[in-house]
Structures are given as C-alpha cells and as structure tokens.
Amino acid sequence: MNFKKTIFSALATLFLVSPVLAELVFPSLSYRTGPYGPNGIPFADGYEDYFTLLNERDGGLGGEPIRVVKCETAYNTEKGVECYESTKGEGSLVYQPLSTGITYQLIPKSAADSIPILSSGYGRTSGRNGKVFKWVFNFPGTYWDAASIATKHAMDMSGGSLEGKKIALVYHNSAYGKEPIRTLEALSEKHKFELSLLPVDHPGQEQKSQWLQIRRERPDYIFMWGWGVMNSVAIQEAANIRFPMENFIGVWWSGSENDVLPAGDAAHGYKSLAMHAPGDNFPVYDDMR
C-alpha cells in the first residue's frame, strides 16, 4: 500500500510539475531606467511583444509556451551579472546582455553553465571565433566589421585613397566604445591615414573639449561609437562647428530617431551603419497589430 501511495504521489507531482518544466524561458536583461533608458525601452518592449505574438499566434515554439523573465540592469555591468546569476536557474535558454561590458563578464560564466549568449552586433568581437568561444554568437556583424565598413566608405568618398587624410574616432569611453580601436589602428597603418582617438565619458552629455579638439585638428572624417544621449549631443556639436555632416559616420548604435531628431535640420547628411532593414513594412508587424 505504501508503495502504491508513493507511485501515485510521484505521478501526481509529475503532472503538476511538467507544464512548468515545458516552458521555454527567455531572460530579458533590459534597461528601462538610467541614462540609457530611452534606448533600452524600445528593445525591451519589442523583445517581449515578439514572444507574446509567438504565444498567442502559434502557441509558443513547437507547442511549448514561452515565458520571459525580466531583470533590470540599468546598463550597469554589476547589475547585469546579478541578473544572470538570479535568472539562470529558471531554465534560461539564451542570454542577450544588451551591453558589451556585461557580455564580457558573462562569457566565462555562460561557458561554464553551457548557456548560449547572443550578442547581435555588440559584445566581444573576437567571440566570433567558435573554436575558442563556443557559447557566444555575435552575428550579423561585429565592431571590427563596422570599423572596416566605415573606413571603406570614407575611402570611396575620397576617390579610393585615404593617404594623408585624418579620421577622428569619437567613442563611448567603455568596453563597447574601445572595440574598434585596434582595427582602426591597423587600417590607419595600412591605408596611411592619421587616426585620433577622442573618448567621451559616461553618459556623454559633456563633449565640449572633444569638439574643440576636432575644430582645431580639422579631421576629414569622424567615426562615432556612441550610445544614448552621447549621440544626439555629438551630432549637435558637429552642427555647431559646421562639420560636413556627410563625413560624419556613426556605428549602428548611433543611428536611431532619438539620435538625430534633437538636432533637427542640422542633422541632415549624417550617416550611420545599419545591420537591419529600417521601418515597419514587414508581415510580422501586421501580425503584431
């Protein structure tokens, strides 16, 4: 009798627990607060909305419901690591840290825990070497790709040669902003252009000294690795010194409406790289509406 009770108890527990075990857990390490909130909110909303769509339209993935576990990082590396530690035990399938600094810290942890990291267009560029970093995936592009593409565009604008030209890199003074430096230094040596490095401290509202230096040195091109308010301030400062906007090129994290609208018409001509098609003229948006 005791054996039968044990079997029935175990079966009852299994049926009670199995729906929970069947959930597909996707952690959302988002930042809706802090100085980068205006950039973090749209991504966090879109991430959650897409999984809501999959649940309501398709019944989840492969018949399994999706659960999004939210954790606020405020774009702070320490908080990001705390979010990882507090959510990985929920059966998290993949992490998107949304921060190069957080990504660097999570790479060894995720490898030890066998949990993939998807850092689309950010994070540790060398992580694309799958022989070394088996749990990191950073498609569709890296910051080394971006540095090369921006340089190629500047070269095309200069008639095929950058020899004797000056390029200034205005960058967020963080792991993210420093990612393209070694690539640009190598390209500078290869193509014989002069590279100047102008770091901007977090959050990026104060840039007077950097733009005074730009005004003094008169670079032919400016590349920007910015984020948040830093972008709009830089574009406005470029307009203030009448820098030719067509020669001002931002990475893909420096090309949203939030970045250009504050400068108004003065932003016309400014360019940024892109790793996705803009707009909402795609079938998935019809389903979400």
Model feature map: region roles:
Residues 23-31, 66-70, 165-169:
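Short, well-ordered beta-strand elements
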Residues 125-126, 134-241, 279-287:
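Extracellular/periplasmic Venus flytrap/periplasmic-binding protein
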Residues 87-100, 118-120, 166-171, 197, ...:
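Periplasmic-binding protein-like
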Residues 238-289:
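Extracellular/periplasmic periplasmic-binding protein-like sensory domains
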Residues 17-22:
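Sec/Tat signal peptide C-region and signal peptidase I cleavage site
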Residues 1-10:
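Bacterial N-terminal signal peptides that target proteins for export
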Residues 25, 38-45, 57-129, 139, ...:
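Beta-alpha junction/loop-to-helix N-cap segments that form part of ligand/metal-binding clefts
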Residues 45-68, 160-162, 189-192:
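Signal peptide-proximal N-terminal region
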